[in-house]
């Protein structure tokens, strides 16, 4: 008769390795998401002051918004000192020069771009990095040249979405006009 002894410590290491492998395989889904339409988000109450910015009509006959213009506007907003405020600031309050947070700067850029005729623009609330503890706000702009990430709080210019990396700018919620979205990993959608 042969007796086999299983060391409990080795079993714990096996389960730790197994859970680590599952966790690392899930990391690859960051940055790849599908936006699902929703009726409400946790931010609806806070955003009541700036809802009109998101739902404003884009003026007809405006000049095309260039990447150079957007980079200038990002630089202007980036130079405003950072200061967190729970309440969302209006674009006018942000332009006053008093400290503004990522929400205020993103909404001010959204407003300025829309006034000048930009379309296919989304306000995103999500994580700046996969390990961020707090949420962050930025814009995504779809153009014929690709999707741009516009973050006037962190960056001095626009970056193409493919250049920011898979572990950066991870959306949780998106707002485009009157439409609201919840981000879901693309891998979950592929399984259904």
Residues of each region from the PLM?
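N-terminal secretory signal peptides that target proteins for export/translocation
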Residues: 1-11
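Intrinsic disorder/low-complexity segments
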Residues: 9-11, 27, 31
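Basic side chains
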Residues: 12-13, 105
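Small/flexible residues
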Residues: 14-15, 124
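Bacterial N-terminal signal peptides
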Residues: 16-26
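A structural boundary/capping signal
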Residues: 29-192
């Amino acid at each position: 008769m042969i007796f086999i002894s299983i060391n409990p410590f080795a079993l714990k290491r096996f389960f730790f390795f197994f859970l680590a492998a599952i966790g690392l395989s899930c990391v690859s889904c960051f940055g790849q998401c599908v936006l699902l339409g929703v009726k409400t988000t946790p931010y609806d109450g806070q955003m009541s002051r700036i809802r009109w910015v998101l739902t404003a009509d884009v003026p007809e006959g405006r000049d095309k918004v260039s990447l150079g213009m957007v980079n200038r506007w990002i630089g202007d907003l980036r130079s405003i000192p950072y200061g967190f405020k729970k309440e969302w600031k209006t674009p006018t309050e942000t332009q006053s020069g008093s400290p503004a947070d990522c929400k205020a700067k993103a909404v001010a850029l959204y407003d300025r771009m829309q006034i000048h005729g930009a379309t296919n623009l989304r306000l995103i609330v999500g994580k700046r990095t996969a390990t961020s503890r707090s949420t962050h706000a930025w814009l995504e702009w779809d153009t014929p040249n690709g999707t741009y990430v516009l973050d006037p709080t962190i960056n001095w210019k626009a970056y193409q979405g493919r250049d920011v990396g898979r572990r950066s700018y991870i959306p949780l919620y998106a707002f485009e006009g009157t439409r609201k979205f919840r981000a879901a990993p693309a891998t979950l959608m592929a399984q259904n």
